[in-house]
């Protein structure tokens, strides 16, 4: 009888430990697949941002639109260091550099597995101040006129604050 009474607290402690461990696991486990984030750094300031738009590459009507936009404090003296994760760099991706006059936006296309980081001056002598950076993952589609075009199926955005 004494042995049964002595093992009861041990069993109770084990059950409570298992319950606490399961509860902790439920609190810290991931909630589905994480979407990729880009990061932008300039003179001591870092921002990481998830996608503004993220579509199924096979069905461009199946989209999530969290509309996330990062903000990065910058100055004219220091460039922006943009970094993309491997999941983005493994595909063709486009960098849009948006200036004060959006008509001066530049576009640079990167081939798969060629770039993980890009250094971008915050001021261009001809275009002025850089106001934003956009990273796009591209998909080829045939438009209504039968032309083959590249369109973004995912997009990340960082606004620069002078």
Curated annotation (Swiss-Prot):
Keywords: Signal. Residues 1-24 form the signal peptide. It holds the Pfam family DUF2771. It comes from the Bacteria. The keyword Signal applies. InterPro entries: DUF2771. GO terms for cellular component: plasma membrane. This is Uncharacterized protein Rv0875c. It comes from Mycobacterium tuberculosis (strain ATCC 25618 / H37Rv).
């Amino acid at each position: 009888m004494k042995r049964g009474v002595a093992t009861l607290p041990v069993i109770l402690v084990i059950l409570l430990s298992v319950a606490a461990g399961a509860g902790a696991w439920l609190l810290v486990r991931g909630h589905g697949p994480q979407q990729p984030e880009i990061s932008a750094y300039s003179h001591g300031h870092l921002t990481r941002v998830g996608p503004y738009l993220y579509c199924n590459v096979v069905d461009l009507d199946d989209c999530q639109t969290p509309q996330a936009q990062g903000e990065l404090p910058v100055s004219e003296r220091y460039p922006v260091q943009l970094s993309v994760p491997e999941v983005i760099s493994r595909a063709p991706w486009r960098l849009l550099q948006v200036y004060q006059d959006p008509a001066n936006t530049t576009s640079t296309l990167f081939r798969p597995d060629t770039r993980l980081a890009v250094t971008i001056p915050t001021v261009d002598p001809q275009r002025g101040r850089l106001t934003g950076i956009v990273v796009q993952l591209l998909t080829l589609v045939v438009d209504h006129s039968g032309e083959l075009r590249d369109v973004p199926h995912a997009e990340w955005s960082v606004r620069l604050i002078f």
